[in-house]
Amino acid sequence: MINRDNKKAITKKGMISNRLNKFSIRKYTVGTASILVGTTLIFGLGNQEAKAAENTSTENAKQDDATTSDNKEVVSETENNSTTENDSTNPIKKETNTDSQPEAKEESTTSSTQQQQNNVTATTETKPQNIEKENVKPSTDKTATEDTSVILEEKKAPNYTNNDVTTKPSTSEIQTKPTTPQESTNIENSQPQPTPSKVDNQVTDATNPKEPVNVSKEELKNNPEKLKELVRNDNNTDRSTKPVATAPTSVAPKRLNAKMRFAVAQPAAVASNNVNDLITVTKQTIKVGDGKDNVAAAHDGKDIEYDTEFTIDNKVKKGDTMTINYDKNVIPSDLTDKNDPIDITDPSGEVIAKGTFDKATKQITYTFTDYVDKYEDIKARLTLYSYIDKQAVPNETSLNLTFATAGKETSQNVSVDYQDPMVHGDSNIQSIFTKLDENKQTIEQQIYVNPLKKTATNTKVDIAGSQVDDYGNIKLGNGSTIIDQNTEIKVYKVNPNQQLPQSNRIYDFSQYEDVTSQFDNKKSFSNNVATLDFGDINSAYIIKVVSKYTPTSDGELDIAQGTSMRTTDKYGYYNYAGYSNFIVTSNDTGGGDGTVKPEEKLYKIGDYVWEDVDKDGVQGTDSKEKPMANVLVTLTYPDGTTKSVRTDANGHYEFGGLKDGETYTVKFETPAGYLPTKVNGTTDGEKDSNGSSITVKINGKDDMSLDTGFYKEPKYNLGDYVWEDTNKDGIQDANEPGIKDVKVTLKDSTGKVIGTTTTDASGKYKFTDLDNGNYTVEFETPAGYTPTVKNTTAEDKDSNGLTTTGVIKDADNMTLDSGFYKTPKYSLGDYVWYDSNKDGKQDSTEKGIKDVKVTLLNEKGEVIGTTKTDENGKYRFDNLDSGKYKVIFEKPAGLTQTVTNTTEDDKDADGGEVDVTITDHDDFTLDNGYFEEDTSDSDSDSDSDSDSDSDSDSDSDSDSDSDSDSDSDSDSDSDSDSDSDSDSDSDSDSDSDSDSDSDSDSDSDSDSDSDSDSDSDSDSDSDSDSDSDSDSDSDSDSDSDSDSDSDSDSDSDSDSDSDSDSDSDSDSDSDSDSDSDSDSDAGKHTPVKPMSTTKDHHNKAKALPETGSENNGSNNATLFGGLFAALGSLLLFGRRKKQNK
């Protein structure tokens, strides 16, 4: 029995294994013209299972018994009548004018969707009406303009057509009726019936075979072998091949078989739980319908096809799971709840994984069987069909659909399109099938009545349990439902502020007003038709119909149901608009009434893999030969899918379920460390080796002679010696020792490291178990050594350098050597000296400077050593390699860098920072010199303001002769208090009273390299009473260098009696403020002698005798000088005071 999964999936191509059917519905819509009395119900046909698809047609008929002129007047009025609808509440879509007028001639036919108008008798004239499909969006105005021509126009034919697909006609016609509006109970139509055009708008088979298979159901019943052949052919059909749309060859409608189809290849292995990370997606695509426009016409049966191909890692084990995710806006089936996914099977029918579907997450979870433990390198191919979820997407919109295999996503932008209401005059209606219950044998239909909310009069809605022909005649036996008093019919009223979803599918009716009870007396049943009388309405209504159906004897679902709305216009004409929905299915089964022949015989291939020790390609010629286990063997089917298995402990393998006459390929994976043996080493096909790849055709029997042999690939060594080349000649001498613990690295031809080792105590190293090929050997230079010269002599005695290439060709290679010699070390340094004569040259009398810090930096600027000069000024850095260095001298405190680079490098000064390069020698030429320099800094700034106010009247005659010679070099800090009393007797008598108040404030700030700071504050209070007649001649020569800080208070009283009488009264007030800032730098530093020591110009020291009597003349001059200084000070202070006042 073929895997049916309780789902029907037979097509004219025969039994399809591993298919799941999904139901969808298409529509036929009929818009009917206004007629007078005796209206015929017109229902078009449409089919669809897991999705809805309808065709629309309109009929416009009127018979006028008035005169021709009257008819013309009516026609004229109608032609010029333009109506505008404004509906801001309903998102029901576009209007499309689709009128047609039947031929008046009998037996005439047409093959197009446009019917020709023909004249009728002179007393009868048809009035063309405008049949419309109306699109009304919220707050959008639409104007329907009536045309004088009558044209039948299809609403979008579905875009995918199968060779098995049949078409259903949909026509509308104009009939002549009496002028008085009446209902006719006679469904028959006496007018001649033209042959309708065929419309490609119905359910198609999603299987899309490569070629049409024209075979009848009866033929399948009588010839079961033919059925099996069709199944096998379908399994081998390439999933990606899609047929070109062709003209249908049958008028029997066909149900859409939405399928999931798989093709697989090989096995795997790991722990349980989700193993999405072990699934590799090789291809993913999303296609809408025929893939031309990415428009998902949800009511026209356009499906979304998701194709995915993936491989399953060999680590996957039984019980592990992987996931497939649908987009949240789609569902696997549009009409039923049959969402169980198909099992994944290989071409022989063995199950690889079983799936379960989670409706909440829209995810399939596949659980792997033990198939993945038996086989390897499994490849799978999967095609999933789904449909727009009308609950998730209630209105037209654009979506980005995303599907995923094992978490790897792919996306596609699509536009969702829903059907239009069928409109003629005030009649506007649309319907779809919404749910199929095969267990209860019921079908649910939802009908929108007046979705455009027009003002409709004399409104009646018919629900017919059958298809109708092109003229409204009921056609029994071509699909039906049961419409009677047991049919569930519910009516709901739509409030003005409510919007109907464009999907034409209501999931929650509680939001609408249930007015079913209002139709208890307005509902009638007759001839499998229910009629509801709505009367005059301006609201929209929803009718939900749940009717019964009877399956056919072979289990097919021949279901059809139609509905129409009729109203009268202001002239009393009926306007018709209608839809019909239907489902027709094919049953996918292998049974029937005939006798099924026994299952087709299947065959197997396989045999043996062995180790061919003697490499002769023949089994059993050496006693050491043995079977090889765990060798991977892969079978490729004719369709390109594969499966793999490994040899068992006895070296055997086997593939079963193979079909006669088909060709397969067997490939053996060469085990690591082995090589394939000789092919066809004997004429005995049972004992030879067939090689790594074998192509075999099944010829009515098993083939267990497909063997292959391998032999171990020989291994080789590589290495030799690392030695100390003491004479640096690059040749291994007998007395030169090996170097131990040298690291050696081996790389393959791709640069990958395949081994590391170190030399032993004798300097030897070796790499083993190597195959033929090219290798690279790298030696790491030992610490304290330098590589010697390379390639100087014979290959086995020279040095190959730090990196060398070794080739193994069917033999060991022990010639890769490397030599090193000990790296010499060097020293650097010299001398730091006191360059007393500042000439930058080391003189024999100049001494070294001790404790000078010297820093050594390497080429990177890193400090590698510091030291200080010894007591002789010497310094040194040892154990240095050849290279670049920098020496930095730190200048001693108080000393100055001497001039640099004045003479030979070993006798001059190199400066504070010196760059030096050592190349295989010491360098003791890095010197530096410093000297001590006198430095004087003096900056003097003096600001003096003296104000002296003096009024003096003096009459004095004085004669004094004084000669004073003084040379003084003095740096002193003294505090002197002097009291002098002088008595002089002369011819002059002077009486003088002088009162002087002097206040002198001097502030001096001096910065000097002579370390001298002077702050002088002098306050002098002098009261002098002098009576003198004096004649003084004084010659004073004084050379004084003095820096002093003194505070002097002098009180002098002098009494002199002379012949002159002078009365003097002097009052002096002096205020002196002096601010001095001195900074001087003479570039020289002179030691400062003790402040108490003074020298004269001639360097003759002098001191005042304790008696104070030595050099009286000088003393007198000093006294008078002091008095005059005091007087001058008083005068200055008094002037300043006067100025201040």
Curated annotation (Swiss-Prot):
GO annotation, cellular component aspect: extracellular region
Biased composition regions of type Basic and acidic residues, renumbered to the chain: 61-75, 92-108, 130-145, 216-241
Chain ranges for the short sequence motif LPXTG sorting signal as given in the UniProt record: 1104-1108
Biological process terms in GO annotation: cell adhesion
Keywords for this protein: Calcium, Cell wall, Peptidoglycan-anchor, Repeat, Secreted, Signal, Virulence
Primary location group: secreted
Composition bias, Acidic residues: 903-913, 930-1080
Compartment list: Secreted, Cell wall
Region Ligand binding A region, residue ranges: 53-601
Residue ranges, compositional bias (Low complexity): 77-90, 109-126
Secretion signal, residue range per the UniProt entry: 1-52
One Pfam family matching this protein: Gram_pos_anchor
Membrane-topology descriptor: Peptidoglycan-anchor
Subunit description: Interacts with host complement factor H/CFAH (via C-terminus). Interacts with host complement regulator C4BPA.
Record protein name field: Serine-aspartate repeat-containing protein E
Gene it is expressed from: sdrE
